[in-house]
Structure formats: structure tokens, C-alpha cells
């Protein structure tokens, strides 16, 4: 009998020990779950009236921007209620609250609206409110945005904030409350109408209580063409090369590099990157500058400028010319970077002859080049060039689905020297997104589409928007000329000035550029330093382009006529990116 009693005692003690351990583990692992259940069970003190804002996903369904639940202490004021009593009750729950701030919270907004007394409660504070069972105080759930990949592309995704004073009238007229949060930048602003959802509708009763008429409807989800894994890979490449560059001479002004990768047949952007070097350990994401910051792009735009020669029958491609320099009256001579021998149009692209482009510009002005000649030009010649450049997407708004896109600077002065500069990409400035639009249009043989980030929008799983990638314009140029540009660009990347910039296995085509740029290094409003900026734009494979790539590195070196060392960061970045693409192709073939 004693053995039985002893066994029973041991069994009971063991049972309660195991049960205690189980409850401890359950509480630890499922604390938030049971907290939510507790709130649900005590629903009389819970109010959820705002719709969930739509989320943002990448092309593979990876969550990029989501919603994080926030618990708040709230109160709903009754008619003729003494606010002093409400403040005292609030201080009983949280003595650390400032009474003046509680009064301010109670007096915000309309009388029938819930008043937020304390924001962002911890789980412990929520339990404290629920266990104290305060009269008429309740837990109000709200949500704030969270970014799955930190600051990566955050300026592209945009921000959500309260309505600003200057936009107050617009939003109030469109059904918003003054206290609502709205998208104020990036995709959040561009697609506000889809992301915001529909608020719950209530009837305000005579006693200031609310009766639900219709529940809230969550916002729609954006699905981007972006591949976040590729974005992260490209960021790593840019950072690595900026660190390497800063160890080399003449790179004190090199801090930024931009990359955009897309599908030229649709304009879908699969990676958009911008990194600014602060030191070897710290960088800042400046991806949005791809659509707002402009630079002289240099020879990379010669696919568009040589099109002027084709369209206006200024090129006899059965005839070769001897590369040299152009010397106009009273002006310094202008040359290619070296003497390049005899050239036709394809060889001129391959070796990036400035002289060949100068001859086209002079012919456009109705003259044949003679050394020391006087050349008269008008707005007409500049307009012809700029209209051709614009037909490719340079010097105009591209229409990318982001707010506040800016175009580069369009020069206002008209002179023979500047016309020659315009012909080689050394006058007007363009943004990286304009450069992408140009190379995509070229790769599509004249079909211009707007670059885009969102390919689909879903609401509760149903597709409510599908990007159809409309052709916005066709460049007025025949197929035979595109074939010649393609041949020239193919030669650039395989035999010419761009040799080694892109992995040969991808069968690439493209163009490089080096341009003069200028800096105000002491911020006194005056240009004091000349630099060189480096660019490249290409696509692959040449026979049926699937991908396009642009790389822009402003102020990469001193403007020293290439007599000193230049770290060609665009070469290294574009090569590593295309090596990565080649490795993906090899892996897919192995599978």
C-alpha cells in the first residue's frame, strides 16, 4: 500500500511538472497567438476599422513591403462626457502618460472618431489593459509599413505618411479623413488608388456610437517585375567595385554607380540599383536617382545620333572615310580619342569615331567639311537631332510608373561647336532611365515602350490590372539601318571599345561612353572641377534581345585627356553582372 501511495505521489508530481513545462513552452512560442485570441474573445473592447494597405511583392512572389500590426490604447467619447474623468482613468492604466498629451489626443478629430491615447503598445501593455478591464478604453489595431529588405529600394517603394497641409483639400475632396495615411512618394504614391483599400462605413447614432454599414476592404497588392535576388546581387557587385575603385588613383570624386536591367521587348525592369559610397563599410541606396539625376552620357548615345545620318541620307555606307579631326574657324580642333584609320558607319560605331559623327552634323547643316571652314547652324539642326534622340527616349519623360520623374538638361545655346558636341553625347544630359529607354528602343528596332515596375495588381487573389506594355512610338528608321547599328554595336562589345564589358557567351551588343562632366566641389555655386563620367548600355543576345543593361558612373576620374590612370568601373560592373547571367544560363542548361 505504501508503495502504491509513493508511486501515486511521484506520478502526480511528475504530471504537474510536465504540465508546467508544457504551458511555459506554449506561452513562449504562441504568446502572440493567444494574445490575439484574448483580444478576439473580448471583442467589445476591440475596434478595427481601417483597411489593410495592399502589399508589394517581387516577380517571384517574395514579399517586399508588408503591414505590421500595431496595438494602441483608444477611447470613444460619449456625448457630454467629462474629459477630466477620462484623463484620470487613462493615467490609472499608464501613470507615466502626460495628462496634457492625453487631453490633446482626446480633442483631435471628429467627436465620433476613436481617440488614440497611447500608440504602439507592447504585448505586456496590451495584457495590462485587458486584465485591468478599464471602463470604455479598448485596444485599437492599426498597421504600419515594414520593409522586408531594409533600405534596399525603399526610395523606389516610397513612404506612407499623414496628409500634408498643401494636399489637404485634394484628399478631403476624394473621401479621405485628415488623419488618414497616404502614399507620399515612390510606388506608394503612384499606386495609392489601388493600395489604399476601402474604409469601413458607419452610421453615427444619436448617442455618438457607431453602427457598421459596410466593413473595410483591404487594398490591392502590387506585383513587380523586380527580382529582389538579382537586385541584391547587383548591389553587392556595385559595392565591391566602388570599394576597389576608391583604392585607385584619381577616384576621389567617384562615389555613385547606377545600374538598370530590363527586358527590352516589354520595358519590364527586373533590377534598378543605385549605390553611394560613404566608406568601405557604409553605402546608401540611391536607386530613385535613376529617374531624377542626369549626366552627360557621351558616345553611348551614338546609336541614336547616327540615325540622323541614316534618316536624312547623309551616310554613304559603301564609302569609307579616313578618321581625323574637325577644325572649324576660330575653334579648337575636335577629334576621336585616337586616329582610327579608314571607317564606314559600322566601323565608326565599333571604334567610337567622333570624326564620323562630326561629318554627319556638318552635312546636316548643308556643308561639306573643309579644314578651318566657317559653319553656320540654326535651331533647326539641333531640333532634328533632339527629335531623333527623343524618339529613342532621350531628353523626354519616359513614363515610368513612378512620380516626380525628371528629364536632363537641354542646352539652350546654339553654335557650331555645340552641335558637334550634341552629335557625340557631350551637350544635353540624360537620366539613367532615359538611357535605358534608348537602349530598349534600339534593341526592339524602333519600338519604344515606357519602362515599368508593376506588371500586375491583385485584389483578394483576383487580377484587376495587367500591364500590356503598349508601344508608345516607332522610330522612323528602316530595318536595314537597324541591322547596321546592331552590327556596329555587336562589334563594339566583341572587338571594339567595349571588348570585355559583357560576357561573350551571351552574344552581346552595346556601346560605351566617356563624357566630360563638371563639379562644384566646395558648394559655392561655381563649377571648379572637371571630371570624366563613364557609361555603358547594351543588350543580349544580339539576334533576339532578351535583356538590356545600363551602367552609369558619374565623376569616375579626373578630366585629364586620358593621360593618367582611369579605373573603368563600368567595365568591371557590367562584366560581373553578365558573368552572373551567364552562370544562370549554364545552370539552367545543366538542369
Region spans (language model):
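Periplasmic/cell-envelope proteins involved in peptidoglycan metabolism and beta-lactam response
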Residues: 1-282, 389, 521-523, 559-591
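Charged, low-complexity surface patches
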Residues: 50, 118, 298-299, 378
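Beta-lactam-recognizing serine transpeptidase/beta-lactamase-like catalytic domain environment
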Residues: 63-65, 201-213, 226, 251-298, ...
Amino acid at each position: 500500500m505504501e508503495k502504491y501511495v509513493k508511486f501515486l505521489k511521484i506520478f502526480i508530481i511528475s504530471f504537474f511538472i510536465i504540465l508546467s513545462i508544457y504551458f511555459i513552452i506554449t506561452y513562449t512560442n504562441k504568446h502572440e497567438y493567444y494574445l490575439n485570441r484574448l483580444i478576439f474573445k473580448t471583442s467589445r473592447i476591440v475596434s478595427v476599422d481601417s483597411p489593410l494597405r495592399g502589399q508589394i511583392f517581387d516577380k517571384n512572389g517574395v514579399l517586399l513591403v508588408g503591414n505590421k500590426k500595431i496595438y494602441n490604447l483608444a477611447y470613444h467619447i460619449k456625448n457630454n462626457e467629462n474629459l477630466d474623468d477620462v484623463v484620470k482613468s487613462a493615467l490609472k492604466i499608464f501613470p507615466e502618460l502626460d495628462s496634457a498629451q492625453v487631453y490633446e489626443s482626446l480633442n483631435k478629430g471628429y467627436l465620433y472618431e476613436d481617440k488614440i491615447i497611447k500608440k504602439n503598445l507592447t504585448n505586456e501593455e496590451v495584457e495590462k489593459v485587458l486584465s485591468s478591464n478599464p471602463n470604455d478604453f479598448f485596444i485599437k489595431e492599426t498597421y504600419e509599413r515594414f520593409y522586408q529588405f531594409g533600405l534596399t529600394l525603399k526610395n523606389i517603394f516610397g513612404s506612407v505618411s499623414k496628409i500634408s497641409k498643401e494636399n489637404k483639400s485634394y484628399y478631403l475632396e476624394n473621401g479621405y479623413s485628415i488623419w488618414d495615411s497616404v502614399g507620399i512618394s515612390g510606388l506608394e504614391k503612384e499606386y495609392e488608388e489601388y493600395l489604399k483599400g476601402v474604409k469601413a462605413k458607419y452610421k453615427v447614432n444619436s448617442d455618438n456610437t457607431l453602427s457598421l454599414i459596410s466593413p473595410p476592404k483591404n487594398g490591392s497588392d502590387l506585383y513587380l517585375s523586380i527580382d529582389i535576388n538579382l537586385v541584391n546581387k547587383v548591389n553587392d557587385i556595385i559595392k565591391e567595385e566602388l570599394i576597389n575603385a576608391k583604392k585607385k588613383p584619381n577616384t576621389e570624386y567617384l562615389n555613385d554607380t547606377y545600374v538598370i536591367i530590363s527586358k527590352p521587348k516589354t520595358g519590364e525592369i527586373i533590377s534598378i540599383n543605385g549605390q553611394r559610397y560613404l566608406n568601405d563599410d557604409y553605402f546608401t541606396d540611391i536607386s530613385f536617382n535613376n529617374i531624377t539625376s542626369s549626366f552627360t552620357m557621351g558616345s553611348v548615345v551614338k546609336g541614336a545620333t547616327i540615325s540622323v545620318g541614316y534618316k536624312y541620307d547623309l551616310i554613304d555606307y559603301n564609302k569609307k572615310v579616313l578618321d581625323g579631326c574637325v577644325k572649324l574657324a576660330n575653334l579648337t580642333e575636335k577629334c576621336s580619342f585616337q586616329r582610327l584609320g579608314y571607317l564606314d558607319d559600322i566601323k565608326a560605331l565599333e571604334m567610337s569615331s567622333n570624326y564620323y559623327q562630326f561629318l554627319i552634323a556638318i552635312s546636316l547643316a548643308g556643308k561639306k567639311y573643309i579644314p578651318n571652314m566657317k559653319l553656320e547652324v540654326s535651331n533647326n539642326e539641333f531640333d532634328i537631332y533632339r527629335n531623333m534622340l527623343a524618339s529613342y527616349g532621350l531628353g523626354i519623360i519616359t513614363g515610368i510608373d513612378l512620380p516626380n520623374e525628371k528629364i536632363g538638361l537641354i542646352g539652350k545655346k546654339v553654335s557650331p561647336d555645340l552641335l558637334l558636341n550634341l552629335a557625340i553625347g557631350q551637350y544635353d544630359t540624360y537620366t539613367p532611365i532615359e538611357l535605358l529607354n534608348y537602349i530598349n528602343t534600339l534593341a526592339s528596332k524602333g519600338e519604344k515602350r515606357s519602362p515599368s515596375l508593376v506588371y500586375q495588381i491583385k485584389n483578394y487573389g483576383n487580377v484587376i490590372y495587367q500591364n500590356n506594355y503598349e508601344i508608345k512610338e516607332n522610330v522612323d528608321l528602316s530595318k536595314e539601318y537597324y541591322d547596321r547599328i546592331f552590327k556596329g554595336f555587336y562589334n563594339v562589345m566583341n572587338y571594339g571599345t567595349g571588348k570585355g564589358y559583357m560576357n561573350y557567351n551571351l552574344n552581346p551588343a552595346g556601346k560605351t561612353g566617356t563624357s566630360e562632366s563638371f563639379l562644384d566641389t566646395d558648394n559655392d555655386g561655381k563649377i571648379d572641377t572637371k571630371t570624366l563620367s563613364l557609361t555603358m548600355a547594351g543588350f543580349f543576345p544580339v539576334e533576339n534581345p532578351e535583356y538590356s543593361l545600363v551602367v552609369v558612373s558619374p565623376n569616375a576620374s579626373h578630366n585629364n585627356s586620358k593621360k593618367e590612370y582611369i579605373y573603368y568601373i563600368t567595365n568591371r560592373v557590367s562584366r560581373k553582372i553578365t558573368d552572373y547571367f551567364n552562370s544562370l544560363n549554364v545552370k539552367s542548361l545543366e538542369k
